[in-house]
Amino acid sequence: MFDAAPIKKVSVVIPVYNEQESLPELIRRTTAACESLGKAWEILLIDDGSSDSSAELMVKASQEADSHIISILLNRNYGQHAAIMAGFSHVSGDLIITLDADLQNPPEEIPRLVAKADEGFDVVGTVRQNRQDSLFRKSASKIINLLIQRTTGKAMGDYGCMLRAYRRPIIDTMLRCHERSTFIPILANIFARRATEIPVHHAEREFGDSKYSFMRLINLMYDLVTCLTTTPLRLLSLLGSVIAIGGFSLSVLLIVLRLALGPQWAAEGVFMLFAVLFTFIGAQFIGMGLLGEYIGRIYNDVRARPRYFVQQVIYPESTSFTEESHQ
C-alpha cells in the first residue's frame, strides 16, 4: 500500500507498576506471541517504581537462558507514559509495540499489529471491542477521547488503549521532544503521516486493581488539556471580554434609564453597583488570561527536567549497567 522499510525486528515495550501477579502470565503469553512472528524480537519491561516484587521477577526473567527480555528499573514512579519513553530509549527494533501489563489487551493481538504495520503505516492504533471496564471508566474514556479529537483534530477512535505499534522513525522523533508531560498516542499521531486503527479484544482484569483512580483520571484530563494547547487560556480571555462588554453595556443602559425614569427606578444604585462589579470582574478575567498565556509560554520554555531516572538496565545473559540519569 505504501512504500515503507521492511520490518526486521519487533520490540515490545511494557510498563510495569505493581503487577507481580500478572507478570508470569504476561511474559509467557507475550513471548509466545513474539515467537510466532517469524522475525527477530525483544521484550522491554520497565519497572515504574513498583513497591511489590515486580522488579525482582523482571530481573529473574532477563537472566534466564535464551531470554529476550530487557528489564529497565526506574528509581521511583514517574507514570505510565514516562516509563514507556524510558523503554523507547533502549529499543533496537524497526517496529515498537506498546502493551499494558494488566493483560486486558491480549498479547495475542501483537501479530495483527505487525501485519498491519507491514502494509506501510507509521502508527497502528487499536480500538477496544466489548470493553470490560466499569461504566465510570468507559464514560471517562469517551470524554477524554472527545476532548483529544476536538483539540488535535485527529479523529482516532480510542486514544486510551495503549496496545499500539509505532515505526522506528516515529519513536526517534518523539525521543527528541522534551515535554515533561507526554501523552504518547497523541504525540505519535502528530508526527505520523500514515496512521490507522484496528479493532482488538478486551478482557477483564484478572489480577489486582486498575492504577487509574478517579483523581488520576482527573489529573490525566488536566494534563491533556494543558500540554496539548493554550486554547483554555485564550477562552479565558474571551470570556473576560464578553463579561466586560456586557457589564459596560449594562452600565450605559442603567445610566440612560436613571436619567429617563429618575433615581427611584435604579433601587438606590444597587443595579449600577452590579454593573460596575461585572465590568471589573471581566477585566480581571482578561488580565488573568493574558498573564496565564505568558506564564504558559515561559513554563513551556524552561521545563527541562528529566522525564525519568533510569537506575539500572538488565540485559539478557546477566549483563547490566547502571545509568546516572536519562532524558
Swiss-Prot record:
Alphabetically ordered keywords of this record: Antibiotic resistance, Cell inner membrane, Cell membrane, Glycosyltransferase, Lipid A biosynthesis, Lipid biosynthesis, Lipid metabolism, Lipopolysaccharide biosynthesis, Membrane, Transferase, Transmembrane, Transmembrane helix
Periplasmic side: 257-269
Spans within the Cytoplasmic topological domain: 1-235, 291-327
Bilayer topology: Multi-pass membrane protein
Catalytic activity: UDP-4-deoxy-4-formamido-beta-L-arabinose + di-trans,octa-cis-undecaprenyl phosphate = 4-deoxy-4-formamido-alpha-L-arabinopyranosyl di-trans,octa-cis-undecaprenyl phosphate + UDP
GO MF terms held by the record: phosphotransferase activity, for other substituted phosphate groups; undecaprenyl-phosphate 4-deoxy-4-formamido-L-arabinose transferase activity
CDD domains: DPM1_like_bac
EC class (word): transferase
A matching Pfam family: Glycos_transf_2
Residue ranges the record marks as coiled coil: none
GO-annotated biological processes: 4-amino-4-deoxy-alpha-L-arabinopyranosyl undecaprenyl phosphate biosynthetic process; lipid A biosynthetic process; lipopolysaccharide biosynthetic process; response to antibiotic
Bilayer-crossing regions: 236-256, 270-290
One GO cellular component, as annotated: plasma membrane
Known pathway: Glycolipid biosynthesis; 4-amino-4-deoxy-alpha-L-arabinose undecaprenyl phosphate biosynthesis; 4-amino-4-deoxy-alpha-L-arabinose undecaprenyl phosphate from UDP-4-deoxy-4-formamido-beta-L-arabinose and undecaprenyl phosphate: step 1/2; Bacterial outer membrane biogenesis; lipopolysaccharide biosynthesis
UniProt EC number: 2.4.2.53
Record's subcellular location: Cell inner membrane
Main location: membrane
UniProt cross-references to NCBIfam families, sorted A to Z: PRK10714.1
UniProt-recorded name of the protein: Undecaprenyl-phosphate 4-deoxy-4-formamido-L-arabinose transferase
Organism: Salmonella paratyphi A (strain AKU_12601)
Lineage: Bacteria, Pseudomonadati, Pseudomonadota, Gammaproteobacteria, Enterobacterales
